[in-house]
């Protein structure tokens, strides 16, 4: 896993070049937006149980066959595994938000996840719907302007959305 700083330095080093002005400007902007980034991570983390529970509740209301006898989330053990997986995906999304880089999400969460779900007979499309529901909830919570660092958060919210989209497409 490389954070945004290590990634830029590593790429410049591999090319045998100094950091460019545009790279330094991009990293400076990342530092300037650091408080907003921490606010977003804190909000999502502080509401993680609610985000996961509500996303699961909504998913099962839309796809009741998942919790019916024979469904992939039928029995308390399978339901717990489903909620655990949603929680893990959300946790790694917050790591990516904090780092400003999706590599931690890719390397430690998404790599091989689709194949695991296929092997278990878990419908990846249902997992993707659950991730999208977490995305909607997380964006609503993170985008609330009350009590957070002031400033334009449009690009940060787009970045947050992209991590959820990456997770959803990885399992679909």
Swiss-Prot record:
Induction info? Phycocyanin-1 is expressed at similar levels in green and red light (constitutive phycocyanin). Constitutively transcribed in vegetative cells, not expressed during hormogonia differentiation in red light.
Q: Which GO terms describe its biological process?
A: photosynthesis
- Gene3D superfamilies this protein is in? Phycocyanins
- State the Pfam families in the record: Phycobilisome
What does the entry report about post-translational modification of this chain? Answer: Contains two covalently linked bilin chromophores.
List residues binding (2R,3E)-phycocyanobilin 1: 82
Residues with the N4-methylasparagine modification: 72
**Where is this protein found?**
Cellular thylakoid membrane
Q: How does it sit in the membrane?
A: Peripheral membrane protein
Q: Which InterPro entries match?
A: Globin-like_sf (IPR009050), Phycobilisome_asu/bsu (IPR012128), Phycobilisome_asu/bsu_sf (IPR038719), Phycocyanin_b (IPR006247)
Q: Where does (2R,3E)-phycocyanobilin 2 bind?
A: 153
The terms describing its cellular component in GO are: phycobilisome; plasma membrane-derived thylakoid membrane
- Stored CDD domains: PC_PEC_beta
Q: Cite the entry's keywords alphabetically.
A: Antenna complex, Bile pigment, Chromophore, Electron transport, Membrane, Methylation, Photosynthesis, Phycobilisome, Thylakoid, Transport
Quaternary structure, per UniProt, is:
Heterodimer of an alpha and a beta subunit, which further assembles into trimers and the trimers into hexamers.
Described by its record, this protein's role is as follows: Light-harvesting photosynthetic bile pigment-protein from the phycobiliprotein complex (phycobilisome, PBS). Phycocyanin is the major phycobiliprotein in the PBS rod.
Which family does the UniProt entry place this protein in? Belongs to the phycobiliprotein family.
The name of this protein is C-phycocyanin-1 beta subunit
Question: From which organism does this entry originate?
Answer: Microchaete diplosiphon
């Amino acid at each position: 896993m490389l954070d945004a700083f290590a990634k830029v330095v590593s790429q410049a080093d591999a090319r045998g070049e100094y950091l460019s002005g545009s790279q330094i400007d991009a990293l400076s902007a990342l530092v300037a937006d650091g408080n907003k980034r921490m606010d977003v991570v804190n909000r999502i983390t502080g509401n993680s149980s609610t985000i996961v529970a509500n996303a699961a509740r909504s998913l099962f209301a839309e796809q009741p066959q998942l919790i019916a006898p024979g469904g992939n989330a039928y029995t308390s053990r399978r339901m717990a595994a489903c909620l655990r997986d949603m929680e893990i995906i959300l946790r790694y999304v917050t790591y990516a938000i904090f780092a400003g880089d999706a590599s931690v999400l890719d390397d430690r969460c998404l790599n091989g996840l689709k194949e695991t779900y296929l092997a278990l007979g878990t419908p990846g499309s249902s997992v993707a719907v659950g991730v999208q529901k977490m995305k909607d909830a997380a964006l609503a919570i993170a985008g609330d302007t009350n009590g957070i660092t002031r400033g334009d958060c449009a690009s940060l919210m787009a970045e947050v959305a992209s991590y959820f989209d990456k997770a959803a497409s990885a399992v679909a």
